[in-house]
Amino acid sequence: METLNLIKNDPWLEPFEDAIKGRHQHVLDKEAELTNKGKQTLSDFASGYLYFGLHRTADGWIFREWAPNATEIFIVGTFNEWKELKKYSLKRKDYGVWEIKLPADAMRHGDLYKLIVHWEGGCGERIPAWATRVVQDEQTKIFSAQVWSPEKPYKVKKRTFKPNTDPLLIYECHIGMAQQEDKVGTYNEFREKTLPRIAKAGYNCIQIMAIQEHPYYGSFGYHVSSFFAASSRFGTPEELKELIATAHGLGIAVIMDIVHSHAVKNEVEGLGNFAGDPNQYFYPGARREHPAWDSLCFDYGKNEVIHFLLSNCKYWLEEYGFDGFRFDGVTSMLYYSHGLGEAFCNYGDYFNGHQDDNAICYLTLANKLIHEVNSKAITIAEEVSGMPGLAAKVEDGGYGFDYRMAMNIPDYWIKTIKEKIDEDWKPSSMFWEVTNRRKDEKTISYAESHDQALVGDKTIIFRLIDADMYWHMQKGDENYTVNRGIALHKMIRLLTSSTINGGYLNFMGNEFGHPEWIDFPREGNGWSCKYARRQWDLVDNKNLTYHYMADFDADMLKTIKSVKAFQATPVQEIWHNDGDQVLAYMRKDYVFVFNFNPKQSFTDYGFLVSPGTYEVVLNTDNPAYGGNGLTDDTVKHFTIADPLYEKEKKEWLKLYIPARTAVVLKKTK
């Protein structure tokens, strides 16, 4: 095998060439095995959802389940009074597959059903592993699979939508908590009420959390039980498909927060002990249980598990029209330790034999499959260790993700706000942090996501303003803490979004500084949705200051989108001075200037730029965004020649930059 581009692009990886090539060869060998040496495609292999589970046929129904440890399986449901009848007994076929064919009148759309699985020494009720619809009884809270075969099913149109990744601007959202009311929101409400807000705000992609069915609402969707079922607490499959189609009509891509890093422990609702075999889907021994998440870890070395998970990826793309995935918990998959207690200080930590090569192989195959099914699909890795090659091309020796989350950035901002007084905020440190990434891998930059909004943590705006958000967000209050918070909120988001090399992400409501943390209904809060909703009335009320942040956010995105391939343009630092707390950098014809100094405004502060005329296109101090309006944004700024820099073709751009403000200028001539 020739030297891979991953190593050519980073000479520091040369000592680990054998390990990198070994992982790459593992992927090639596994792909050859699964595709019968290329006689079929990965997409052909990943079509299990068309075979397993319940399907309507021309003359009735057919149901199949993989349960090699079972001795007997019955379908029970509302159609047979939940009794084990011979008529509903499955027959064992080859390779641990069980099958039953039923006449058309044996069940109907809307019927509830489960399996009763028998094995040596026991039996139990189970929801089918490939169930595409699972519902919960309002009174008993019991989950059951549901026959889903409407007379007029929603047909997903042939794929013509092409996501706009120039740049990718992601709105992270959750269907259930997207509404104003103290309740669980629905797909229809999101489509009718929330999508228009997102489109107006300027985002071109939504990343939806908690789609795969999960027994406990408060898990935020991360303890999945039924991997092929769209959560029924939000509505029907048809309603989710219509939501996605409507988003496409608005120019918005839809990606799913997919959970393949672990599964819920539940045995009746989930896969935990499907047919009396606790290791049917999961690793044996100590590796079966995740020590931190109270969940189960898939056995990525088992072909049947790879088949299940790859089919799951293809299912959501083909059956619902999703445009891709954000893979949750990738760090947990990559390492035997799940990354817990690891520092990841040097490259040796990525190639020391503590990595799960089976999981690495699965993730790489998943990326190959997803892009085979849809070449325009988007894949994003949530990964905190910094594993090299994660978002590099497979043929270059990488794992094939399109993007990786820049998880260092929100950590940096929270640490800065928590631990440093304003006078100690260092622009050199900020710039290094937001641009600290591998040159051959694209990232999704973000100041905060849902992680920072969860109960026990605080959003950026709440850390900045805290209790004053309850009393002083009205216009005219002139509260110092509020004014400071809004100013820094705008500056932090501008610095984060304007230095992207791939995309930018915002969590639902944070664009306008949504107050308080997220606390899902649970026994400890009386099962209330009060803190698991979005208070849109705050941003809609023009007597409050929330809309200043939302208006700035929208114009910030407009500025970014006005530059073709903005994310691909070099970020060139012009100046930083930690004493003054001033930072300036350029992208194409745009100059970004920040003054983080809390007290000192600067007159005629000079920056060396290419000669020309510069005009203000965005200013955090604009009164329209809650600023003080200390500068005239209509003034044109002409550069001043200096013989010292004539050879470098640079001239001085001199500006008045008020304290705690940022401005974006465009070279117009």
Question: Which residues make up each language-model segment?
Answer:
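The feature marks proteins involved in alpha-glucan
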Residues: 1-58, 62, 83-84, 89-172, ...
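Surface-exposed beta-strand/loop patches in extracellular or lumenal glycoproteins
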Residues: 63-67, 73-77, 597-613
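Conserved, mostly hydrophobic/aromatic
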Residues: 65, 115, 173, 198, ...
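C-terminal beta-strand-rich structural cap/linker in extracellular carbohydrate-active enzymes
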Residues: 109-113, 588, 633-669
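Substrate-binding/active-site clefts of carbohydrate-active enzymes
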Residues: 135, 153, 157-165, 170, ...
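Conserved alpha/beta catalytic core and glycan-binding cleft of carbohydrate-active enzymes
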Residues: 321-323, 341-529, 561-606, 613, ...
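Aromatic- and carboxylate-lined catalytic core of secreted/periplasmic carbohydrate-active enzymes
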Residues: 367-368, 374-375, 534-573, 659, ...
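C-terminal substrate/ligand-recognition segments
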Residues: 489-510, 545-552, 556, 655-657, ...
